[in-house]
């Protein structure tokens, strides 16, 4: 527990510096985190076999991560570029599958593309949130996933009776899930007050509170789906943790799975409510 608390505190300090400085610092840190996250997920899905050298499918995937962030930093929120990099990666992986057949399996092709979309691409929306005029505030919104997780845990311990997904995650309850969503909305209300007071004084307080309550409501629901997806992948491949990078927490995907999953939704909802 002590190790978990210490590493958690260090993680928070690094987040404050990363999101506070913005620009190339934020992009650089996200790139590094994305590379590790991609590697963890790719290994879990069998794109790269454990304890084996870096294979061509994963090398191409890692190269795509670097290219994606370069494009992101030079063009910003260019959705056409997002689609192009996904298609380019798919074609490259498909070519490897065809011309190296039967060295690589079709599962590795699918896993390489899925890992890229899930970890690096979805996580990169934090950079886009940080690029908003009020990005120093908005970039923190994805971490409502941790608020949701905390409220869900304590609500489940205190009130949990009905299982949410008994096969996939036996300890999760419907009561805990509802508590997590309510905790997320409470955070959204408080965030809305802070946002209207300090980030954008021109925004009406009521509008800010309602906007962020809706954003965090959706985030609270998606956060739990993201957590269950990550758990399902681990169960399917019989692994306990995605990695060991963060002592007491596991890997990047263990700590950021829900954060990653909700970030694109938060970005697009922010475009709608804060335009």
What are these regions (language model features)?
Residues 1-217:
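Membrane-embedded alpha-helical bundles of polytopic integral membrane proteins
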Residues 262-263:
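C-terminal-most transmembrane helix of multi-pass membrane proteins
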């Amino acid at each position: 527990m002590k190790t978990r608390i210490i590493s958690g505190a260090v993680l928070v300090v690094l987040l404050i510096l990363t999101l506070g400085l913005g620009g190339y610092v934020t992009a650089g840190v996200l790139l590094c985190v994305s590379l590790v996250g991609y590697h963890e997920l790719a290994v879990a899905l069998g794109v790269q076999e454990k304890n084996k050298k870096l294979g061509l499918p994963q090398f191409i995937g890692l190269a795509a991560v670097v290219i994606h962030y370069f494009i992101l930093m030079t063009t910003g929120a260019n959705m056409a570029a997002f689609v192009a990099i996904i298609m380019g990666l798919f074609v490259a992986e498909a070519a490897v599958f065809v011309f190296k057949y039967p060295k690589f399996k079709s599962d590795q092709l699918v896993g390489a593309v899925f890992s890229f979309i899930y970890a690096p691409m979805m996580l990169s929306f934090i950079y886009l949130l940080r690029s908003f005029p009020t990005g120093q505030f908005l970039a923190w919104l994805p971490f409502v996933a941790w608020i949701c997780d905390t409220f869900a845990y304590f609500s489940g311990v205190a009130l949990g009776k009905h299982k949410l997904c008994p096969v996939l995650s036996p300890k999760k309850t419907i009561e805990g899930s509802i508590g997590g969503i309510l905790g997320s909305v409470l955070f959204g209300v408080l965030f809305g007050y802070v946002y209207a007071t300090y980030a954008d004084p021109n925004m009406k307080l009521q509008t800010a509170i309602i906007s962020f309550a809706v954003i965090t409501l959706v985030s609270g629901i998606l956060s739990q789906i993201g957590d269950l997806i990550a758990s399902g992948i681990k169960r399917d491949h019989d692994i306990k943790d995605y990695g060991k990078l963060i002592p007491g927490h596991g890997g990047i995907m263990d700590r950021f799975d829900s954060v990653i999953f909700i970030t694109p939704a938060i970005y697009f909802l922010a475009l709608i409510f804060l335009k």
